[in-house]
């Protein structure tokens, strides 16, 4: 180094004037085994990397909460026969825990049962779940991680539709409903 560059470094406040630097700010690689040929201590290197993961906040305070019940465990089905609407939050909690819920609402009054179905259907919709009517006053509600398939759809066949006039089976093309506004209004022309 020349005299002018040393003088410039002193005036500018260069800390590395003599090529020395403070090693206290840097971590050493003592965690790794330096005696290996490079590939023998792979698992301990991964363990050291996983411990240094900045996204792993096990002990820290994180504001992110997870969905309860997310795991690779077997699916669970909860059968509920509520007698009042007050028991419906239990069904929502079961859905949040990724459990499939079967509601048997035969023990409830019809207006309370309708209210219960609407409540649980709203909760199911909120978690992107599925709902299916299984039978008379029996409903299946499943979270998004469960696929619900229905192999039997209740669709009326053409032979089961009855005509009001001749009380016999008719095809669906004949049964086109007449609009309510045109049936009873006499023409004024």
UniProtKB/Swiss-Prot annotation:
Residues 152-163 have a biased composition (Polar residues). It is found in: Cytoplasm. One of its GO terms (biological process) is FtsZ-dependent cytokinesis. The keyword Iron does not apply. Keywords: Cell cycle, Cell division, Cytoplasm, Septation. The keyword Ribosomal protein does not apply. Residues 152-189 are annotated as: Disordered. InterPro entries: Cell_div_SepF (IPR023052), Cell_div_SepF/SepF-rel (IPR007561), SepF-like_sf (IPR038594). Signal peptide: none annotated. GO terms for cellular component: cytoplasm. Cell division protein that is part of the divisome complex and is recruited early to the Z-ring. Probably stimulates Z-ring formation, perhaps through the cross-linking of FtsZ protofilaments. Its function overlaps with FtsA. Homodimer. Interacts with FtsZ. Belongs to the SepF family. This is Cell division protein SepF. It comes from Prochlorococcus marinus (strain SARG / CCMP1375 / SS120).
């Amino acid at each position: 180094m020349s005299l002018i560059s040393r003088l410039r470094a002193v005036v500018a406040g260069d800390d590395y004037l003599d090529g020395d630097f403070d090693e206290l700010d840097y971590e050493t690689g003592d965690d790794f085994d330096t005696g290996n040929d490079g590939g023998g201590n792979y698992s301990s290197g991964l363990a050291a990397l996983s411990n240094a993961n900045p996204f792993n906040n096990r002990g820290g305070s994180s504001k992110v909460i997870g969905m309860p019940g997310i795991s690779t465990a077997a699916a669970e089905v909860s059968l509920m026969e509520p007698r009042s609407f007050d028991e419906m939050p239990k069904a929502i909690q079961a859905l949040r825990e990724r459990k499939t819920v079967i509601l048997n609402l035969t023990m409830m009054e019809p207006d309370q049962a309708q209210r219960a179905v609407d409540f649980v259907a709203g909760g199911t919709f909120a978690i992107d779940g599925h709902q299916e009517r299984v039978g008379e006053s029996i409903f299946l509600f499943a979270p998004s991680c469960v696929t619900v398939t229905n192999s039997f759809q209740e669709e009326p066949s053409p032979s089961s539709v009855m005509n009001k006039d001749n009380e016999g089976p008719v095809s669906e093309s004949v049964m086109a409903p007449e609009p309510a506004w045109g049936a009873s209004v006499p023409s004024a022309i």
